């Protein structure tokens, strides 16, 4: 699975693995990315996202996907999530 996320803002980190003898070997630490279907109450449907586990906790703390997308800056979202956030804003404004 590609380590690309639609929510979460995490990217692979690079660094050195250091052994007991202090030999340094380059390596990458990959974020814990999961594919989930999160329910949008406003849209009345599920939205499939690839999300880091820390962002999944943030979604839970915000009270759901709708509140999280309304709270986060649009510049931190991918184009597909910006589209979903715009749909949520339009539905909430119409209601």
Swiss-Prot record:
Q: What is this protein called?
A: Large ribosomal subunit protein bL28
Q: How is this protein annotated for GO cellular component?
A: ribonucleoprotein complex; ribosome
Concerning SUPFAM superfamilies, the annotation shows: L28p-like
Gene3D superfamilies per UniProt: Ribosomal protein L28/L24 (2.30.170.40)
Q: Which domain of life is it from?
A: Bacteria
User: What family does the entry list?
Assistant: Belongs to the bacterial ribosomal protein bL28 family.
Provide this UniProt record's keywords sorted from A to Z. Ribonucleoprotein, Ribosomal protein
């Amino acid at each position: 699975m590609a380590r690309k996320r639609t929510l979460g803002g995490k990217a692979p980190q690079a660094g050195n693995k250091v052994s007991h003898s202090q030999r340094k070997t380059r390596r990458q630490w990959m974020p814990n990315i999961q594919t989930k279907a999160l329910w949008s109450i406003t849209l009345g449907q599920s939205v499939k996202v690839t999300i880091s586990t820390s962002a999944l906790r943030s979604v839970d703390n915000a009270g759901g996907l709708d509140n999280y997308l309304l709270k986060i800056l649009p510049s931190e979202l991918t184009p597909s999530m910006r589209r979903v956030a715009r749909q949520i804003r339009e539905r909430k404004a119409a209601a």
